[in-house]
């Protein structure tokens, strides 16, 4: 009898694993498939999901379409204002991730507080922080106007909101909230400013700041402990004949750098004078 119980228990465990695996396509493989068809909306090497914007690489407006997050969201999370906009390619993945976070943890506390910003908005924030905290603090956590990746609409800042008493607090990525940090890559997002990369990114640790780069790239960056700067640098030495190979999901991607817009491949400008291609 005990043997029979063990067999049944083992069968249930196997079924549970299969169900868990079977859930992946709905939240993962379709987004992965869509990332295979990624293109910039212009021929510019300055635009696209892998465009690097930091203190050394100024933002260039290439006309990427931005949409209002309020019009696409569910009730799984909050917005600090209805006028938060994001690059259209980041909207559905973000909503899916936050829906899944709520369904997994039961927490309806995530508050999206920032998305796309104009240069003027960044200037206002930069000046306000300087007046309040001083230059050194501001330089550590806020990019100068024109050099913030918030201009791209591919970056998002999270906070926490308690709907019962109306209080808010910083998102620290700890406890149940670590789910977002650990699973962000499945939706194409990365932790943009890791704690151990301050000397490279030039920005202090920001667990609340996520950047959309697409699933294959997010997977490689996250699993190899890189920041976006390191990933772009790595790809500079990769060519179509000798690409970086990324095995993720059911696919193996070939990723490489090229000087001109590639043909028959998904691509993004790197904002460093070239393009990143993958297929």
Located regions from the model:
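Extracytoplasmic cell-surface/polysaccharide-interacting catalytic and binding patches
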Residues: 4-10, 15-115, 119-279
């Amino acid at each position: 009898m005990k043997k029979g119980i063990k067999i049944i228990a083992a069968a249930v465990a196997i079924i549970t694993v299969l169900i868990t695996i079977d859930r992946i396509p709905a939240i993962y493989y379709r987004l992965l498939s869509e990332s295979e068809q990624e293109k910039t909306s212009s021929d510019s090497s300055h635009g696209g999901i892998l465009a690097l914007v930091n203190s050394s690489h100024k933002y260039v407006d290439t006309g990427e379409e931005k949409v209002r997050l309020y019009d696409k969201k569910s009730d799984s999370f909050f917005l600090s204002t209805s006028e938060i906009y994001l690059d259209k390619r980041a909207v559905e993945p973000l909503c899916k991730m936050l829906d899944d976070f709520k369904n997994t943890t039961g927490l309806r506390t995530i508050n999206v507080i920032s998305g796309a910003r104009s240069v003027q908005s960044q200037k206002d924030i930069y000046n306000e922080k300087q007046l309040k905290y001083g230059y050194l603090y501001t330089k550590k956590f806020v990019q100068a106007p024109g050099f913030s990746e918030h201009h791209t609409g591919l970056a998002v800042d999270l906070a926490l909101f308690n709907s019962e008493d109306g209080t808010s607090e910083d998102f620290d990525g700890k406890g149940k909230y670590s789910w977002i940090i650990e699973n962000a890559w499945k939706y194409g997002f990365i932790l943009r400013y890791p704690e151990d990369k301050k000397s490279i990114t030039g920005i202090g640790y920001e667990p609340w700041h996520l950047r959309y780069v697409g699933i294959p790239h997010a997977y490689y960056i996250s699993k190899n402990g890189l920041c976006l700067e390191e990933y772009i640098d790595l790809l500079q030495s990769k060519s179509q004949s000798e690409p970086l190979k990324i095995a993720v999901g059911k696919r193996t991607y070939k990723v490489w750098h090229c000087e001109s817009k590639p043909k028959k491949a998904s691509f993004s400008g790197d904002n460093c004078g070239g393009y990143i291609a993958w297929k």
